[in-house]
Amino acid sequence: MLDIQFIREHTDIVKESQRKRGESVELVDEVLSSDTARREALKAFEEARAQQKEIGKKVASVPADEKAKLIAETKELSQTVAEYKAKADSAAEEYTTAMWRLSNIVEPEAPEGGEDDYVVVKKVGQIRDFAAEGFEPKDHLTLGAGVAGIDMRRGVKVGGSRFYFLRGQVARMQIAMLTMAVDQAEEHGFTLAITPTLVRPEVMRGTGFLNSHADEIYRLREPDDQYLVGTSEVALAGMHENEILDLGNGPLRYCGWSSCYRREAGAAGKDTSGIIRVHQFDKVEMFVYAKQEDSYKEHEHLLAMEQEMLAKVEVPYRIIDTAAGDLGSSAARKFDCEAWVPTQGRYRELTSTSNCTEYQARRLNIRERMEDGGTRPVSTLNGTLATTRWLVAIMENHQQKDGSIEIPKAMRAYMGGKEVIEPTKWEA
């Protein structure tokens, strides 16, 4: 949610942000109109109530012959007050509804355009020349089957499309990767949290995911009115809902480990095989509560953390600055790290890090205590540190001619010193 005072004073900036996102510019006028109606209705209600109280005070002190008249006026005014109260409540509801539909203000540096209008910030690593090595690279699904590590057939049998089993050494590789991510996060001062994967509607709405991504989210049927999270960002944001934080010693940094669930409603025909786009996966997510003036520095820090992790798994990648029209409603700016996938001949997203400024904090009422005793909303930021999809890039970029998979050096200590995952037959 945005600051209404900012919207009043900088209407053009908010409208320009909506335009860059490809969202309704007229919504800004709707917010301002409902704001005016809300304030006018509230003023009328408060004036009528004050008048009612004033007359009520006089009843006890006036002569008996005047009391009947004042009592009649009080009753009549009570009806007026009730009507004004109803109008004020209705106006407040319309205002809140409009405000919650507004997306965060895009940072001026974010590129304009849609999904394909990102800007490549830099490329890191050397893309392998498999032709020079004398063999055609296998895709991750073929490699996974060859080492008895990815079972899509039985995953579909159990859960339906886009489900899978990770088994054996590939399952161990995921655990190793996620554990390595947690260790790195803790080394940088993040606190590990195993988070809930079911959240209340108020928390999901507060993070902004019900604005533009509602169709991607699983929701439990009544009477259990809860949502399955697509990232631990949701739970970590809700953890300090309605709290006042002490950021005097620096940002609060969390590292969330959770299973994640996504409907992939808009993904018909995309990545229908393999584990790139699935309904359930595991992820380690960074989440930060920071002072408003520190959010940009923290955003750079999260991006550096992602790059450090990518260096450990030794895959070529690039960083892109996401265009305004491809930002989620909460993000003011977002950077993605995309790894090279040899068999697809293109880069695929592995991480994203977003600066949500005060947008989520205002919606969830999360503030910090200031030195003067006052409070103000904090900034929230998030970033991926490792997720199931990383296995695709690791397996394909580290494959050998015989179908084996070389384990990245940094991960070997997490796999008992093992250096290579050898081809093996299914036991069952």
UniProtKB/Swiss-Prot annotation:
Positions contributing to ATP binding: 262-264, 278, 349-352
Its UniProt domain note says: Consists of two distinct domains, a catalytic core and a N-terminal extension that is involved in tRNA binding.
Q: Could you tell me what this protein does?
A: Catalyzes the attachment of serine to tRNA(Ser). Is also able to aminoacylate tRNA(Sec) with serine, to form the misacylated tRNA L-seryl-tRNA(Sec), which will be further converted into selenocysteinyl-tRNA(Sec).
Which GO biological process annotations does it have? selenocysteine biosynthetic process; seryl-tRNA aminoacylation
Supply the InterPro entries for this chain.
Answer: aa-tRNA-synt_IIb, aa-tRNA-synth_II, aa-tRNA-synth_II/BPL/LPL, Ser-tRNA-ligase_type_1, Ser-tRNA-synth_1_N, SerRS_1_N_sf, tRNA-bd_arm
Supply the PROSITE patterns for this chain: AA_TRNA_LIGASE_II
Keyword Cytoplasm assigned: yes
Name of the protein described by the UniProt record = Serine--tRNA ligase
Major localization class: cytoplasm
Carries keyword Cytoplasm? Answer: yes
The UniProt entry, under Pfam families, shows:
Seryl_tRNA_N, tRNA-synt_2b
Catalytic reaction equation(s): tRNA(Ser) + L-serine + ATP = L-seryl-tRNA(Ser) + AMP + diphosphate + H(+); tRNA(Sec) + L-serine + ATP = L-seryl-tRNA(Sec) + AMP + diphosphate + H(+)
Q: Which family does it belong to?
A: Belongs to the class-II aminoacyl-tRNA synthetase family. Type-1 seryl-tRNA synthetase subfamily.
Complexes and interactors: Homodimer. The tRNA molecule binds across the dimer.
**Gene Ontology molecular functions:** ATP binding; serine-tRNA ligase activity
Task: Tell me the compartments it is located in.
Answer: Cytoplasm
- Pathway info: Aminoacyl-tRNA biosynthesis; selenocysteinyl-tRNA(Sec) biosynthesis; L-seryl-tRNA(Sec) from L-serine and tRNA(Sec): step 1/1
